């Protein structure tokens, strides 16, 4: 299936000059969403994954159906102040400022094999932060899966030491 045909491109959103790749048009098509989920499940099964991790919010909508399909758990990565129990945190730089992501301190057990999922790889900052959180808890990142990779932003450089798959690539 050519998933690219299900991606909507929204020009000048969220700011002028950006061509936003909207995956909600994959999700609202059951066949396309199921196909994408199943492809990531196949990838995860080959890596003997114990748990799936995804950053808010679109990492949830990719990772949860994968975890459910595999009969394993899902651990969310959230912005600071959004998780109710004790957390670990990772602060990282943005173009203009910083951001903080957190995970529950008991979300990952040492030695667990982790798949990290998100909708899109752009600059790689969010996924790099998720990796740092998983590894701080003793997890082993055995794979990272995206629906879309924006190759022209070169985010893969931040995660080049990991096994990465994306279902759709944009070169420009």
Curated annotation (Swiss-Prot):
EC class name: transferase
Protein source organism: Staphylococcus aureus (strain bovine RF122 / ET3-1)
One Gene Ontology MF term: adenine binding
Cellular component GO terms, alphabetical: cytoplasm
Signal peptide limits: none
Family the entry assigns: Belongs to the purine/pyrimidine phosphoribosyltransferase family.
Protein name per the record: Adenine phosphoribosyltransferase
Pathway terms, separated by semicolons: Purine metabolism; AMP biosynthesis via salvage pathway; AMP from adenine: step 1/1
Listed EC numbers: 2.4.2.7
